[in-house]
Amino acid sequence: MVAVLTWALALLSAFATVQTQKGFWDYFSQSSGDKSKVARVQQQKLTWEPTSLKDSLEQDLSNMDKFLEKLGPLSGQGREPPGLPHDPEGMRQQLQEELAEVRARLEPYMAEAHQQVGWNLEGLRRQLKPYTVELMEQVARRVQELQEQLRVVGEGTKAQLLGGVDEARGLLQELQTRVVQHTGRVRELFHPYAQRLVTGIGRHVQELHRSVAPHAAASSARLSRCVQTLSRKLTLKAEALHARIQQNLGQLREELSAFASAGAGGAEEGANPDAQMLSQEVRQRLQAFRHDTFLQIADFTRAIDQETEEVQLQLAPPPPGHSAFAPEFLQADSSEARSKLQARLEDLWEDINDSLHDRGLSHLEEP
């Protein structure tokens, strides 16, 4: 609840303009009357039905424009309601100072939660790193094997290429056969590594769920959704990576087969293929496959970093003074920023509702 309160105060201070804040405090002072009334309202909040309260909030927050408009200055809307303090400006200033003091006291707890969640997510990244390292090692190893298995340079090979049309054509047809055979074998060898990566993601993300639960500011339901979403996204990305590796191998097979077929056709027309050129072409195609696959694995690693950083912001937002505190919200008049803010407000509502519900149950259980 501490982090939830701090996040609420942070949203107010970070996203409302000075005029909007003034309107909010005018509205607060006009509707509060006196401290006893505020206390009664707070006590009543514990007995409100969550559904009706959420419906009311959603009606007020139907879009961000209306929300900010409602927080605008209310002093020009007609008669002054009863119970208005004699010095609303002074009351507003006092409330702002008190809230700033409360936020300053709560921010260390929020920073600690952000750090604890970050450490756990960093642990997830460390646990998944061996899978990607192993995958890159396998790519390098299989490329080296293919290069050895598809060699066409040697004294016997040169003699065969120069021995006549039939000999050269036979050698290139044999190369085609070896290309299909060995690339197919490599494709099969990559399946277990892809399966291990997917299994590892599921297992380590579940471990993350258990380790991050004590530190997350989010409600238990939202925590479960965030973790499940992270697991699903990483699993889909791992499966997509495996599909791209298979696609790369299929493309390599087609390119090498087409090259060998073209060489065999040239041999039938009387051209003598150059063994050195054939070997260089095979090597270049294999290195291109290795390079492209390494880039795709690196992209997958960056995706893990990006997804875990997003989860950290969702589960334990940093304090307002932190450099990572909602930088995307600082763009004025941005529809994307407003949409993200609306989503954050929905998350905040769920966390507050969950906390109030828990507090209400504990209050009822007291003797």
Swiss-Prot record:
What GO MF annotations does this protein's record show?
cholesterol transfer activity; phosphatidylcholine-sterol O-acyltransferase activator activity; phospholipid binding
Residues modified to Phosphoserine: S56
Against Pfam families, the record matches this protein to: Apolipoprotein (PF01442)
- Post-translational modification, as annotated: Phosphorylated by FAM20C in the extracellular medium.
Task: Enumerate the SUPFAM superfamilies for this protein.
Answer: Apolipoprotein A-I
Chief location bin: secreted
Record region (Disordered): 71-90
Gene Ontology cellular component? chylomicron; early endosome; extracellular vesicle; Golgi apparatus; high-density lipoprotein particle; late endosome; very-low-density lipoprotein particle
Question: What's its job?
Answer: Minor apolipoprotein mainly associated with HDL and to a lesser extent with VLDL. May also be associated with chylomicrons. Important determinant of plasma triglyceride (TG) levels by both being a potent stimulator of apo-CII lipoprotein lipase (LPL) TG hydrolysis and an inhibitor of the hepatic VLDL-TG production rate (without affecting the VLDL-apoB production rate). Activates poorly lecithin:cholesterol acyltransferase (LCAT) and does not enhance efflux of cholesterol from macrophages. Binds heparin.
Describe its assembly.
Interacts with GPIHBP1. Interacts with SORL1; this interaction leads to APOA5 internalization and sorting either to lysosomes and degradation, or to the trans-Golgi network.
The entry's family comment says: Belongs to the apolipoprotein A1/A4/E family.
Q: Which PANTHER family match?
A: APOLIPOPROTEIN (PTHR18976), APOLIPOPROTEIN A-V (PTHR18976:SF13)
Q: What is the protein's name according to its record? A: Apolipoprotein A-V
